[in-house]
Amino acid sequence: MAKKSKRYQEAASKIDRLKHYNVEEAVELAKETNIANFDASVEVAFRLGIDTRKNDQQIRGAVVLPNGTGKSQRVLVFAKGDKAAEAEAAGADFVGEGEYVEKIQQGWFDFDVVVATPDMMGEVGKLGRVLGPKGLMPNPKTGTVTMDVKKAVEEIKAGKVEYRAEKSGIVHASIGKTSFDTDKLVENFKTLQDVLTKAKPASAKGTYFKSVAVTTTMGPGVKVDTSSFKL
């Protein structure tokens, strides 16, 4: 394991490794211990008590964070006719049909989110092996396969984030930047927490929020006290 830098160790020393902080304290500490020389992302990791091997315990979706993420998302929309015009009017960065399928097959990836109307999924499906591993494949569960392309694009531009539980049951998400006011980051955190609470599978047993941590892009993690989380 690579040795951590002196700056990292100094930042980590400000955190009590045995303590679980309330959300406000955790966010404030994460900001304070950021060691990056740029406006780093503030990230959260929820370790959930789910068994992702079971189909009814798969957690995936999307949520619009009230204060956005601070990141500009480049949106590619696969649509035609009136729906293509709607997507362009809503602010999509790229709108098209087969020409973008070819571009992607040739290695073009200058976008962050892909939206498609259902009638375009036959074409988009050709990109499954390319988009799937990158987490870019449109999916009805995240609202990216839809006829309402206007709403989809506007929500993404407003700060919509997708979340998905990994095999280990961990959900990672960005809740903003270190330049955000603490209360705005806390509001984003609680919005995501509420969504995950509502997504709890009925068959999930035992403790649901096993552990939660807040961190910045390069900073140390801060453990969050989950005892006040309501289920």
UniProtKB/Swiss-Prot annotation:
InterPro entries associated with the record: Ribosom_uL1_bac-type, Ribosomal_uL1, Ribosomal_uL1-like, Ribosomal_uL1/biogenesis, Ribosomal_uL1_3-a/b-sand, Ribosomal_uL1_CS
Keyword field contains S-adenosyl-L-methionine: no
Matches recorded under Pfam families: Ribosomal_L1
Database matches in CDD domains: Ribosomal_L1
GO molecular function: rRNA binding; structural constituent of ribosome; tRNA binding
One example of a Gene Ontology biological process annotation: translation
Record keywords, A-Z: Repressor, Ribonucleoprotein, Ribosomal protein, RNA-binding, rRNA-binding, Translation regulation, tRNA-binding
PANTHER family: 54S RIBOSOMAL PROTEIN L1, MITOCHONDRIAL (PTHR36427), LARGE RIBOSOMAL SUBUNIT PROTEIN UL1M (PTHR36427:SF3)
HAMAP family, sorted: Ribosomal_uL1_B
Similarity comment: Belongs to the universal ribosomal protein uL1 family.
Annotated function: Binds directly to 23S rRNA. The L1 stalk is quite mobile in the ribosome, and is involved in E site tRNA release. Protein L1 is also a translational repressor protein, it controls the translation of the L11 operon by binding to its mRNA.
Assembly notes: Part of the 50S ribosomal subunit.
Designated name of the protein: Large ribosomal subunit protein uL1
